Amino acid sequence: MPTTPIPFTPLHMFRRLLCVGLFLFAGIHTTLGATLPLPSTSYKYTVLDQDLSAALQEFGNNLKISVNISAEVKGRIRGRIPELSPREFLDRLTDLYDLQWYYDGVVLYVSAAKEAQTRMLVLSSVHFSAFKLALDKLDISDERYPVRPAPGNGLVLVSGPPRFMALIEQTLNGLLAVAQAQPRATDTPARESVMVLFRGSSTTVVRGGRPEVFYTSEMLPENDDGGKAELSKK
């Protein structure tokens, strides 16, 4: 029976993104993609006539690997399969039956090639270099499924099997949430306050909380009628 997919919870994603920051700060380098733990010895598997999904499930059971097989994986294995290494055996079935597989570090996901998805993602406030680096540090990147930026770093084109695509979107959403949670510095300067205080025959202009100009009725310039001009409020 297929195993249940293990989703990343927001807390899980936050912890992994925090680890990414620590890796970047410390300058630690990791390999790309989660490594599928397969032995290098030959995998002996005798098949006469068996359902493809059952053979893949038995493959995982024999190697102590959790396997999630899509319902779209169909077919039967007939005939003898040569003695191969476990990785070669998996790749051979993938090529023969038009499949894709992806290992997320916990579960090996096998799906039909026709289930592959292609999406254009909007990076918004996240720069592509930061997005790609997060995928590498979280062991999500896979050289078989490239992530390509569009000119200007605002868009990214991603193609791959369903599990890979789900982790891509979860990572981007996590980075966007972290970016939105950070305080934003405002580029708009504070408006300067100006007050005009009238007290009897004197007038004081206060700009930015500081008295700046002091007038008396004798100091105001005369208008065209020979009277004192009035100081307008600002």
Swiss-Prot record:
It is found in: Membrane. Keywords: Membrane, Nodulation, Plasmid, Transmembrane, Transmembrane helix. The keyword Transmembrane helix applies. It comes from the Bacteria. One of its GO terms (cellular component) is membrane. Gene3D superfamilies: 3.30.1370.120, 3.55.50.30. Its main location: membrane. It is a single-pass membrane protein. Pfam families: Secretin_N (PF03958). The chain crosses the membrane at residues 17-38. This is Nodulation protein NolW. The gene is nolW.
